[in-house]
């Protein structure tokens, strides 16, 4: 049994814990503690009731020291609650923690990971892109087989790299990609304003519900980290839109082989059934963003929107639940790190 602690119980931290109980991994992973500066009452309430993903299937109660999760067999799981801002003071050694899932979105350097290690944890997995000095960055389904036992401090990438990189790999393996551009159409996030207010990024001073808002992205750097051969071959832009969840990614690539739409779509179908099973899905149904809410895949390719120009320029629409899909990949990578 892998003993895990979650550092940061926000959108991703809560989704990871919920996903554990909605998956087949609960008999392999035990969450022994959650470190969060908020009060236990708020932690339990937001875990039980979620505006995006609905009510949690199990009853959740709490006291000042534990979250309690009732199970169908009448037993109860308990998760220790911690409120420690200093990573070096966390009691990972006494709790015998094997792996930290750091879901704060704040920490991501090797030095941050070492603080968890020095506090007694064996390994650390960050929920967002980390520094180049980390032991590895994993996009599960693409390069998780590069994990080594000595890799102690690892990044799980981002929701967008987890979405687009498996699709890029499938197309590149089949046809060879020369270059590409990506537009991320991302739901609003909690670093935006409810109404106009001050922010260091002037575009983010504007109300999230009122505008489509361009934001900076380093997605192309994330692609280069996994595929060095694509250095300076991809560029990306990102906009935030007034929806609560689910992201669409507009991928355009120039490829070395003359193809038709069906060639591209069939490649994704084949990958979804084989090498990228449970990672990438495929649909041609007339769906909209909300239909992909709570979808555990990293990416869902909408084949009805695939276009090919002049045999070599390919455009694809790829969906993902930027919270739920990523949370499920955190669990997959956690198990891969335990081997």
UniProtKB/Swiss-Prot annotation:
Subcellular localization: Cytoplasm
A matching Pfam family: Gp_dh_C
Site (Activates thiol group during catalysis): 186
Enzyme category, top tier: oxidoreductase
Keyword Electron transport: no
Keyword tags: Cytoplasm, NAD, Oxidoreductase, Pyridoxine biosynthesis
Disulfide topology: none
Active site: 159
Thylakoid among keywords: no
Biological processes annotated in GO: pyridoxal phosphate biosynthetic process; pyridoxine biosynthetic process
EC number: 1.2.1.72
Residues that, per the record, bind substrate: 158-160, 204, 217-218, 240
Reaction(s) catalysed (UniProt annotation): D-erythrose 4-phosphate + NAD(+) + H2O = 4-phospho-D-erythronate + NADH + 2 H(+)
Residue numbers binding NAD(+): 11-12, 322
Record pathway: Cofactor biosynthesis; pyridoxine 5'-phosphate biosynthesis; pyridoxine 5'-phosphate from D-erythrose 4-phosphate: step 1/5
Domain of life, source organism: Bacteria
GO molecular function: erythrose-4-phosphate dehydrogenase activity; NAD binding
PANTHER family in the cross-refs: GLYCERALDEHYDE-3-PHOSPHATE DEHYDROGENASE 2
Subunit structure: Homotetramer.
Protein family: Belongs to the glyceraldehyde-3-phosphate dehydrogenase family. Epd subfamily.
Role of this protein: Catalyzes the NAD-dependent conversion of D-erythrose 4-phosphate to 4-phosphoerythronate.
UniProt protein name: D-erythrose-4-phosphate dehydrogenase
Record organism: Aliivibrio fischeri (strain MJ11)
Organism phylogeny: Bacteria, Pseudomonadati, Pseudomonadota, Gammaproteobacteria, Vibrionales
């Amino acid at each position: 049994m892998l003993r895990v602690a979650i550092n940061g119980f926000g959108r991703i931290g809560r989704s990871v814990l919920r996903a554990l109980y909605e998956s087949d991994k609960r008999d392999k992973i035990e969450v022994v503690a959650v470190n969060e500066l908020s009060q236990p009452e708020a932690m339990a309430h937001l875990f039980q009731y979620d505006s995006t993903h609905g009510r949690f299937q199990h009853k959740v109660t709490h006291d000042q020291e534990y979250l309690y999760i009732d199970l169908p067999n009448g037993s109860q799981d308990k998760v220790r609650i911690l409120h420690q801002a200093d990573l070096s003071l966390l009691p990972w050694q006494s709790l015998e923690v094997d792996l930290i899932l750091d879901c704060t979105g704040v920490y991501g350097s090797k030095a941050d990971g070492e603080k968890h290690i020095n506090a007694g944890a064996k390994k650390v997995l960050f929920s967002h892109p980390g520094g180049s000095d980390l032991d590895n960055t994993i996009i599960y389904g693409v390069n998780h087989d590069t994990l080594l036992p000595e890799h102690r401090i690892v990044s799980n990438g981002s929701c967008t790299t987890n979405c687009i990189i498996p699709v890029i790999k499938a197309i590149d393996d089949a046809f060879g990609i020369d270059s590409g551009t990506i537009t991320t159409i991302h739901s609003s996030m909690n670093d935006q304003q409810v109404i106009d207010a001050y922010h260091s990024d002037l575009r983010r001073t504007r109300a999230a519900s009122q505008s489509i808002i361009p934001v900076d992205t380093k997605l192309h750097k994330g692609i280069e980290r996994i595929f060095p051969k694509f250095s300076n071959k991809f560029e990306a832009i990102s906009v935030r839109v007034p929806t609560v969840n689910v992201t669409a990614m507009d991928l355009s690539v120039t490829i070395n082989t003359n193809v038709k739409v069906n060639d591209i779509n069939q490649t994704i179908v084949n990958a979804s059934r084989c090498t990228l099973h449970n990672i990438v899905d495929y649909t041609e149904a007339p769906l909209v963003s909300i239909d992909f809410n709570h979808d555990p895949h990293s990416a869902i390719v909408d084949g009805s929107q695939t276009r090919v120009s002049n045999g070599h320029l390919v455009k694809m629409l790829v969906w993902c639940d930027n919270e739920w899909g990523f949370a499920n990949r955190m669990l997959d990578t956690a198990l891969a790190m335990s081997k």
